[in-house]
């Protein structure tokens, strides 16, 4: 789809290799080994104009972001049910790294030029729970789950989803990235980004015995759940902030 191709340049992870690594899980962390700053950005355009926002971003942002060592990843996808809405999982080394990115001359140009096409923008601060991915690869199929968990079950749910998502990236060569975040203001609300090699890889994972076990184990903990599907994606995995592990 043309809009996806245009917006792929806005997924500014640094002009990375597109070869696929063997099955392994590698966390995104700061140089000190801590979780980085994570947030979700929800960008909504006026009707039919998300592609124009993507064109602006592709023109003014990539060269600057590539030089920002603290801008780890900007993984963006377009909702299937609302192609005027893009969700980005943004990962920065620190608050200072985010400040550098958001106040750069290139970003200010992008923000000014997109204004005429922008219907809404929401930033959601979250804490990283699982930030695991392959060393390299290109994800074509992405899903988000929004889970609202019973307060008494938050710790257990976090333990189970962390173990399963880490296992999936570590053992399955077609699961490219698994990300779990919890809202800072509502720590019982979790948002995921699940990145797969392609649609077949996603279906295979969803039909796996391990994933079905995860569903059974967490069913009673979930108060509400929403699944968000996206148009075909082109997420190039970042290398910034990725701690390469040979064996985990």
Residue ranges and their predicted role:
Residues 26-100, 161:
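Ordered, small/hydrophobic-rich secondary-structure cores
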Residues 49-71, 106-109, 153-176, 210-214:
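Short amphipathic alpha-helical segments
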Residues 51, 93-105, 155, 198-208:
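Short amphipathic alpha-helices within nucleic acid-binding modules
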Residues 138-198, 204-205:
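Conserved small-residue-rich
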């Amino acid at each position: 789809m043309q809009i996806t191709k245009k917006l792929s340049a806005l997924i500014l992870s640094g002009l990375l290799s597109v070869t696929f690594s063997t099955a392994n899980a590698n966390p995104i962390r700061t140089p000190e080994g801590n979780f980085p700053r994570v947030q979700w950005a929800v960008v909504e355009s006026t009707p039919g104009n998300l592609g124009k926002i993507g064109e602006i971003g592709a023109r003014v942002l990539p060269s600057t972001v590539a030089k920002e060592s603290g801008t780890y990843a900007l993984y963006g996808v377009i909702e299937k049910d609302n192609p005027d809405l893009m969700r980005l999982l943004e990962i920065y080394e620190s608050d200072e790294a985010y400040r550098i990115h958001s106040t750069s001359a290139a970003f200010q140009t992008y923000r000014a030029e997109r204004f005429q096409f922008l219907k809404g923008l929401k930033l959601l601060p979250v804490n990283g729970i699982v930030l695991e991915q392959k060393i390299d690869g290109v994800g074509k199929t992405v899903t988000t789950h929004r889970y609202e968990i019973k307060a008494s079950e938050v710790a257990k749910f976090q333990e189970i989803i962390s173990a399963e998502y880490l296992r999936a990236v570590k053992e399955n060569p077609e699961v490219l990235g698994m990300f779990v975040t919890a809202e800072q203001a509502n720590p019982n609300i979790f948002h995921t980004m699940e990145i797969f090699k392609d649609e077949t890889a996603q279906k295979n994972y969803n039909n796996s015995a391990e994933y079905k076990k995860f569903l059974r184990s967490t069913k009673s903990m979930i108060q509400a759940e929403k699944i968000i599907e996206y148009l075909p994606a082109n997420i190039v995995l970042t290398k910034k902030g990725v701690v390469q592990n040979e064996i985990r």
